[in-house]
UniProtKB/Swiss-Prot annotation:
This is Chromosome partition protein MukB. Its main location: cytoplasm. The lineage of its organism: Bacteria, Pseudomonadati, Pseudomonadota, Gammaproteobacteria, Enterobacterales. The hinge domain, which separates the large intramolecular coiled coil regions, allows the homodimerization, forming a V-shaped homodimer. Homodimerization via its hinge domain. Binds to DNA via its C-terminal region. Interacts, and probably forms a ternary complex, with MukE and MukF via its C-terminal region. The complex formation is stimulated by calcium or magnesium. Interacts with tubulin-related protein FtsZ. Residues 337-418, 511-604, 780-810, 847-1116, 1206-1265 form a coiled coil.
């Protein structure tokens, strides 16, 4: 009997507290006992690390971290190690009694992340005497040892003979070896498998019901049905492969379309370029000839333009010279007009100033007289006012003195003093030192008489002065008038000059009256002179234009000649227009006919090309439309016959395929209903039992069982008797045999074997004789042999069917081609050749073009002559009315005479105009000039002296009068007499003072009034004098300016000057217009010459280039034609309909095809390179080479086994037919490969039933397990309701959902997912694809719901949840579930490992003290019954009488921390020695 593998020991090297410690593991339970921090969890962590060295999974948390989202930073491993190399190894002995040391090397990695480096390794073949610590450490002293590095360990192991050391770089390889050696219960292929294993170990370590496991019990307990899944995958793969083949066919069809597209685009690309080059070659030849004709005509045109340019340049030079003269004359006329206008304005100003001066002179004389009179009166008033003022002052002084004397006692003295003062003033003023108060009267009389005499003398001189002033004013006025007219004249010659001026004024007035008639006469003559000059210029211009000098007398006869010539040319031009219109109409008709034929020619050529192709395909020649329709009827008959023969072959083929399908049924059942019945009855088909029978025995067994070879073998017939009552869907004869399907034999029949036959005794009175069948079908080998023959026959029929299908499709395509031809081209294909008529019409069009060109040249020359004659006639019409002017030769002399006479009269008129008023004033005053009153100044001086003497005499008389009046003051008689005299004198003085003040007031008022009046008179005089002087100065300036202007300012001068200027402006404008016209014509002519020269140069260049292109293209064209003819592609490339397309259209067609070809040949390096080379426009032969390369490439791709042609175009057509046939066959094959939804449902149901039975057997092993109040534990398995509905629909209602399973777009998995969604629309599928959901639905595990139930106390069976159980009960229940999982894994992996290997079983339990003694005993019993090892940890000893117990105590010794370990193997056994690891 094979023994189960066991873990012998666990070794820790250089762990925290354990330097080199080996724990021997008990075959059942190993207990680690110790206080908190003793090292129990560290020991278990070392075990788990060696078992699952995956840092992504390892996480050794404390029980206090149960509610935390994350554990310690180093996941509990870094802190359990010491610095340096650490080891954790497991010593295992497997079922083969092989010792294997599996473990890991651990080492802390420096850094703040607290990482740990792990390296797994194994050592096989290690002798039993060698302990793990001996090989992992090296003794270096009596009590010292060091840990070996992994490399040193490897070297040490390799030195041992028969010992193998293996280091692993991947955890998968490590676990794979552990599975093969029986260390782990299942193969851990992926991280998911490792995670499940770690979750199981973790769940056992921490105890309780692990939600991570209970939530996914299906993944832990139910094995993956890889066989069924692989069958489904194979079916889908076959379908996928079939569909991929179909897709490949479609791709091939697209490739065929691509090839067709390639040949089509290549033909378009090369043919368009080929025909474009052919067209361009023809166009270049025609262009070269046309350029040569244009070159000759341009040279002729250039000569004509050059001659015309010379003539116009000469005329322009003359016009420029004339324009310079006219501009000079026009500028002079404009200046003269400006001077005349200025002189006219000056003359107007002079006349206005003369009138103003006459008026001012008269007013100034009057004002002078008024001012003189006012001055005299003012002088008298001043004297009178001064005298009155003196008198008042004297009287006031006297009155004041007398008043003062009356007021005080000294009045007499004051009066005396005043009298003395008056006497002194009188002496001084009168220059009389001997004057006294006594002789004052005498002197007063004499001075009064002297005053009277001076006054009389003054009055006499004033009268003389007044008379002298009058005579002197007339003489000065007359003298000023003479000086104004004649300039500076002496006073003695003034009278003679005045007489001469008055004598000459009469003749000058007569001359002034003749100015206007002379001006009118001169204006008329000047106008005629200008007209004569204009006529002479017109005559000169006319002579220049006609190239001949003409006399005025010859103009009338020349006019008659021109009129006759114009009439002749007009009739010729009119006739030429009619003739040209006739030629134009004929040319347009010809062009319209050519256009119609050109538009019809491509259609006709395309129809001819199609007719040629149809003739080649059919091998017939067609002359008219009747033959075409008759041949179509023949095609229909041929197609009908071939179709009938093809359908017969298809029927035979279907029969064979039905036989193949029937023989291909699983288990050899020819009727699918038998499989359902066998499943229903719980039996097995007899054909399945004998499925492995050999080919030689197949005839015997087939004859042996005869009609019952399709029977169903059941274990008990009585059990199915009731089911037969309602049986409907079954064969007519259903055979049932009772027997054990696992050990069935043929002993149920009594049989005698004959020569190739058997006799079967069915009953006592019934025998059956059966011959061996010629083709036995009993057993898989016989069926496969028959299937092979049927398949061969089917292949032959398929080939024959393919040939007939090919012929039918070929006939159909030919019929379709004829149908398209009739609908598209039959109306035009048998018409006359339009190209022949186009060539005839093109020749006629060329003749018409040449005739019209010649005619246009003649017509243009006639039109030029006609225009020239009309222009000359117009000029003559202007000259003929002026012939008399041209013949008048005395006109210039008469103009000069009148102009000289007019100058004289204008001079006299200007003199009269300037001095006429002055002469009129001078005429009555001329006699005054005969005598000059020279004594006027002396009389004026005498008058002034007399006036001064009179004023002095008056003052002297006044002072003497004052002395005489104060004479009494010089002596007083007494005081009373002096007072009385003073009182009388006071009254007298007062009376005189009043009179004097009244006179003074009156004198002041008169003086003020006269002073105001004199001021006004003086202001008016000054204003008039100023105005007179200003206007006199302005008049002098105006006269000087008029003299400086030097023109006559008469009434008609401005009109004449303006008329002259306007005439010259009109002539200048006409000249400039002609000059501008000539300049424009010269510019246009030069531009035309430049254009013609550029055109000529371009034509020469283009002509030479065109000739070079023609020559070069000829060589290249010869190469192209040689390639085309040598390779036989001329018929495909020379597409005559393309000749009617423009070069741009052909280039666009070629470019579009090139773009499509680049995409088409992107994956073909050779064609891509050839295409790239063909893009060179200078090498057209490379496009032909590309076309040839495309044809060669397609010829190489032709399958000669199915296509019988070398022409790629025909091969493409045959390929299309063949691909259609293959598509039909593959679609039929896909229907054969389709997965039956009913069979899928049956397979899933069978698998579910098998797994439910397996779970029930696992439950039997847990029925006796009890923990606390938990009496029993079981695993409940149910099928989900939604999935049950899905299975029912798949098996019974699949017809309702054939739209999913018959769709070519969906795989079976996708169809299954769509059906599931259709049945359960309320379920959210999330982001998963239908393929993923379908694959899940093909896995039976997804149909099951699993949960753990416990039988607890009075509650009965309830769901196992931690909240409903105590801690111990939960730990025990969880441990039971884990044991079930381990058992399930072992059974699942049994077929994957060696038959002589039973894997180790080991679980963990930390903090086992939470279990009571009964539960612990149950655990021990469970481990004993299941041959399972268990490692538990608890603070106290648990059941020390069983298993092995280790007591751990952590101590500090000499500043070093270590764990003291004591081991106990049950009660009564010997205690091992205490071991203390070296520190």
């Amino acid at each position: 009997m094979i023994e189960r593998g066991k873990f012998r020991s666990l070794t820790l090297v250089n762990w925290n507290g354990f330097f080199a410690r080996t724990f021997d593991l008990d075959e059942l339970v190993t207990t680690l006992s110790g206080g908190n921090g003793a090292g129990k969890s560290t020991t278990m962590a070392a075990f788990i690390t060696a078992l699952i060295p995956d840092l992504t999974l390892l996480h050794f948390r404390n029980t206090t971290e149960a509610g935390a989202t994350s554990g310690s930073r180093d996941k509990g491993l870094h802190g359990k190690l010491r610095a340096g190399v650490c080891y954790s190894t497991l010593d295992v002995v497997n079922s083969r009694h092989q010792r294997v040391l599996v473990g890991v090397r651990l080492q802390q990695v420096a850094g703040r992340d607290r990482k740990v480096d792990i390296k797994p390794f194994t050592i096989q073949g290690l002798p039993t005497a060698i302990q793990p610590t001996q090989i992992l450490t090296q003794i270096v002293g009596d009590r010292q040892a060091r840990v070996l590095s992994l490399q040193e360990l490897k070297e040490r192991v390799e030195e041992m003979e028969g010992v193998q050391f293996k280091q692993f770089n991947s955890i998968t390889d490590y676990h794979s070896l552990m599975f093969d050696l029986g260390v782990v219960p299942r193969r851990l292929r992926s991280a998911s498998d490792r995670s499940k294993f770690y979750r199981l170990i973790e769940a056992s370590l921490y105890g309780g019901i692990s939600s991570a496991i209970t939530r996914s019990l299906r993944d832990y307990l139910l094995p993956e049905n890889s066989g069924v899944r692989k069958a489904f995958q194979d079916m889908e793969a076959a379908l996928r492969e079939n569909r991929m083949t179909l897709e490949a066919i479609r791709v091939t069809q697209s490739d065929r379309d691509l090839f067709k597209h390639l040949i089509s685009e290549a033909t378009s690309y090369v043919a368009a370029d080929y025909m474009r080059h052919a067209n361009e070659r023809r166009i270049h030849l025609d262009g070269a000839l046309e350029l040569r004709r244009d070159l000759f005509s341009s040279r002729k045109q250039l000569s004509s333009e050059q001659y015309r340019h010379v003539e116009m340049a000469r005329e322009l030079t003359e016009q420029n010279d004339t324009e310079g003269d006219l501009e000079t004359d026009y500028q002079a006329a404009s200046d003269h007009l400006n001077l005349v206008q200025t002189a006219m304005r000056q003359q107007e100003k002079i006349e206005r100033y003369n009138a103003d001066l006459e008026e001012l002179s008269y007013r100034l004389e009057e004002q002078n007289e008024v001012v003189e009179e006012a001055r005299d009166q003012q002088a008298e008033n001043e004297e009178r006012a001064d005298a009155a003022e003196l008198e008042v002052d004297e009287l006031k002084s006297q009155l004041a003195d007398y008043q003062q004397a009356l007021d005080v006692q000294q009045t007499r003295a004051i009066q005396y003093q005043q009298a003395q003062q008056a006497l002194e003033r009188a002496r001084t003023l009168c220059q009389l030192p001997d004057l006294t108060a006594e002789n004052a009267d005498e002197w007063l009389d004499s001075y009064q008489a002297r005053e009277q005499e001076a006054t009389e003398i003054l009055l006499m001189l004033e009268q003389k002065l007044s008379v002298a002033d009058a005579a002197h004013g007339q003489f000065e006025q007359a003298y000023q008038l003479v000086s104004k007219i004649a300039g500076a004249v002496s006073r003695s010659e003034a009278w003679q000059v005045a007489r001469d001026l008055l004598r000459d004024s009469s003749s000058q007035r007569y001359q002034a009256e003749r100015v206007q008639p002379l001006r009118m006469r001169l204006s008329e003559l000047e106008q005629r002179l200008r007209e004569q000059q204009d006529a002479e210029r017109l005559l000169q211009d006319f002579s220049k234009r006609n190239g001949q000098d003409y006399q005025p007398e010859e103009l009338e006869s020349l006019q008659q000649e021109l009129d006759a010539r114009i009439e002749t040319l007009s009739s010729l031009v009119a006739e030429a227009g009619e003739r040209r219109m006739t030629l134009r109409q004929e040319l347009e008709q010809t062009q319209q006919r050519i256009q119609k034929l050109t538009a019809r020619a491509p259609v006709w050529l395309a129809a001819q090309e199609t007719l040629t192709q149809l003739s080649e395909q059919s091998g017939e020649t067609f002359e008219d439309s009747r033959q075409v329709t008759e041949f179509m009827q023949q095609l229909l008959e041929r197609e009908r016959e071939t179709t009938v023969e093809r359908d017969d072959i298809a029927a035979r083929k279907r029969q064979i395929e039905a036989q193949v399908d029937r023989l291909s049924q699983p288990g050899g059942s020819e009727d699918p209903r038998l499989n359902a019945l066998a499943e229903r009855f719980g039996g097995v088909l007899l054909s399945e039992i004998y499925d492995d029978v050999t080919l030689d025995d197949a005839p015997y067994f087939s004859a042996l069982y005869g009609p019952s070879r399709h029977a169903i073998v059941v274990s008990d017939l009585s059990l199915i008797r009731d089911q037969l009552a309602g049986l409907e869907d079954c064969p007519e004869d259903l055979y049932l045999i009772e027997g054990d399907p696992q050990s069935f034999d043929d002993s149920v029949f009594a049989v005698d074997e004959l020569e190739r036959a058997v006799v079967v005794k069915v009953a006592e009175r019934q025998w059956r004789y059966s011959r061996f069948p010629e083709v036995p079908l009993f057993g898989r080998a016989a069926r496969e042999m028959r299937l092979e023959g049927l398949r061969d026959e089917r292949e032959a029929l398929a080939e024959q069917y393919a040939t007939l299908s090919f012929d039918v499709q070929k006939t159909q395509r030919l019929h379709q081609s004829f149908s398209r031809f009739i609908g598209t081209h039959l109306a035009v294909v048998f018409d006359e050749d339009p190209e022949a008529e186009i060539r005839t019409l093109s020749s006629r069009r060329g003749e018409l073009d040449r005739a019209m060109a010649s005619f246009d040249g003649e017509n243009q020359q006639q039109r030029q002559q006609y225009e020239q004659a009309k222009e000359a006639s117009g000029q003559l019409n202007k000259l003929i009315p002026r012939i008399s002017l041209l013949c008048d030769e005395t006109l210039q002399d008469r103009v000069e005479e009148i102009r000289a006479e007019l100058d004289e009269t204008e001079e006299s008129a200007r003199f009269i105009q300037q001095h006429g008023v002055t002469l009129t004033k001078l005429e009555p005053l001329v006699s005054v000039l005969q005598s000059d009153p020279q004594q006027h100044e002396q009389l004026q001086e005498d008058y002034t002296q007399a006036q001064n003497a009179q004023r002095q005499a008056k003052q002297q008389a006044f002072t003497l009068t004052e002395v005489v009046q104060r004479r009494a003051h010089f002596s007083y008689a007494d005081s009373a007499g002096m007072l009385g005299e003073n009182a009388g004198l006071n009254d007298k003085l007062r009376h005189r003072l009043e009179q004097a003040e009244a006179e003074r007031t009156k004198a002041r008022e008169q003086l003020r009034q006269h002073q105001t009046q004199l001021t006004q008179y003086s202001q008016v005089q000054a204003s008039l004098k100023s105005s007179y002087d200003a206007k006199q100065d302005m008049l002098k300036e105006l006269l000087q300016e008029l003299q400086d202007i030097g023109v006559r300012a008469d009434a008609d001068a401005e009109a004449r000057a303006r008329q002259r200027r306007d005439e010259l402006h009109a002539a200048l404008s006409t000249n400039r217009s002609r000059r501008n016209q000539l300049e424009k014509q010269i510019t246009f002519c030069e531009a035309e010459m430049d254009s013609v020269q550029k055109k000529l140069r371009k034509l020469e260049r283009d002509y030479h280039q065109m000739r070079e292109q023609v020559v070069t293209a000829k060589a290249g064209w010869c190469t192209v034609m040689r390639l085309v003819k040598d390779n036989g592609v001329e018929r495909r490339l020379h597409r005559r309909e393309l000749a009617y397309m423009e070069g741009d259209e052909l280039r666009s067609m070629s470019d579009k095809a090139l773009g499509a070809l680049r995409l088409a040949v992107a994956d073909n390096e050779h064609l891509r390179d050839v295409l790239r080379l063909s893009e060179d426009p200078k090498r057209p032969e490379r496009k032909i080479q590309f076309y040839i390369a495309v044809y060669q490439h397609l010829r190489e791709r032709i399958r000669q086994d199915i296509i019988r042609t070398d022409d790629p175009v025909e091969a493409i057509e045959q390929m299309e037919i063949e691909l259609n046939r293959l598509t039909e066959e593959l679609m039929a094959r896909e229907q054969m490969l389709a997965i039956s939804s009913r069979s899928v449902a049956n397979i899933i149901r069978k698998t579910i039933q098998r797994e439910q039975n397996r779970i029930r057997m696992l439950n039997q092993g847990l029925q006796a397990v009890s923990f606390g109040q938990v009496k029993s534990v079981r695993l409940n398995v149910n099928v989900r309701e939604t999935h049950t509905t899905l299975l029912n629909v798949l098996s019974e209602q699949q017809e309702m959902h054939q739209d999913l399973f018959n769709s070519n777009r969906l795989t079976f998995s996708e169809a299954l997912a769509k059906l599931y969604q259709r049945l359960n629309p309320e379920i959210d599928m999330g982001q998963r694809t239908p393929q993923t959901i379908g694959e899940e639905l093909l896995d039976y595990r997804n149909y099951l719901e699993m949960e753990v139930e416990v039988n607890r106390g009075a509650d009965g069976w309830l769901r196992a949840e931690s909240g409903a159980l105590s801690t111990g009960e939960a730990i025990g229940t969880g441990m039971s579930i884990l044991v079930m999982v381990v058992q399930s894994w072992e059974e699942e992996s049994k077929r994957l490992r060696g038959k002589d290997i039973i894997p180790c079983r080991l679980l963990f339990l930390d903090e086992a003290a939470r279990l009571d003694a009964k539960s612990i005993a149950t655990l021990f019993e469970l481990c004993d019954r299941l041959e399972m090892q268990l490692v538990i940890a608890a603070p106290e000893n648990i059941s020390p009488e069983k298993g092995t117990t280790y007591k751990l105590v952590r101590k500090v010794y000499q500043n070093n921390e270590h764990v003291h370990v004591v081991g106990l193997r049950g009660f009564g056994t010997e205690t091992p020695e205490t071991q203390e690891p070296a520190s």
